[in-house]
Amino acid sequence: FYTYAFGKLTNGFLSDRANIAKFMSTGLGVSAVMNLFFGVTSVFWIFGILWAINGWFQSMGSAPAVVSVTQWFSSKERGTYYGIWAASHNIGEGLTFIGTASIVALFGWQAGFIVPGVICFIVAIILLFSLQDRPETYGLPNVSEYKGEVSTKKKAKKSIKDFQLDVLKSPIVIKIGLSATFLYTVRYAIHS
């Protein structure tokens, strides 16, 4: 849980600079491998180490998804597509509970890790070859320019790093972060 939380913080910054397809597929691929290992070990301390590694790499999923939505859709479209993404995340989680419970009931607890691990590894490979990085990577214009949403304001002189530091210092971001911490604590307590 803690490596996942810390990973969401740091991987959010890294995904701003990384190739989205490589970043997201690496996170999912390593998480898939960790799930395969979960299915073949029953040693508690090994399981704990694998769980921490898994948490870190799972945290590489949401940030690049948000970056991708931001890079490929205009400000007028983002709310719709972000809403679809958020809904699919929750629907997928619910279906995962049902699917994994069925797999465990039919084939045992190890299969509850191995089968999803194999599926996620296949999806990671598909993502690597199908998820597109930023439009500029392919010689396309920025989506804001393409959609005619270019701001008339002067370009900011701050670097991405400076903007990120400003965000971290923002009282509202700190409040939202604390709220999310408590929300996730309750969410995981309910799941358990």
Give each language-model segment a name:
Residues 170-192:
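Extracytoplasmic gate region of multi-pass secondary transporters
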Residues 22-36:
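Structural signature of the two symmetry-related core transmembrane helices
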